[in-house]
Curated annotation (Swiss-Prot):
In muscle, parvalbumin is thought to be involved in relaxation after contraction. It binds two calcium ions. PANTHER family: PARVALBUMIN, PARVALBUMIN ALPHA. This is Parvalbumin beta 4. It comes from the Eukaryota. Belongs to the parvalbumin family.
Length: 69
């Protein structure tokens, strides 16, 4: 799903980071999820997804309705 979106080196690095059994860092995953799930509902709603780019930079644009469908 990420092929063609992320650089191959980034994908390989991410997979290498959790290649060994029991090495997946769920705390890091949920930390990132919590940043996007701004209302802490346990879901990422469309309105939160629209602001996804702003998690990287406050000045980033909001995604359009078409981009979040």
């Amino acid at each position: 799903a990420f092929a063609g979106v992320l650089a191959d080196a980034d994908i390989k690095a991410a997979l290498a980071g959790c290649a060994a059994a029991d090495s997946f860092n769920y705390k890091t995953f949920f930390k990132f999820f919590a940043i996007i799930d701004q209302d802490h509902s346990g879901f990422i709603e469309e309105e939160e997804l629209k602001l996804f780019l702003q998690t990287f930079s406050a000045g980033a644009r909001a995604l359009s309705d078409a981009e979040t469908k």
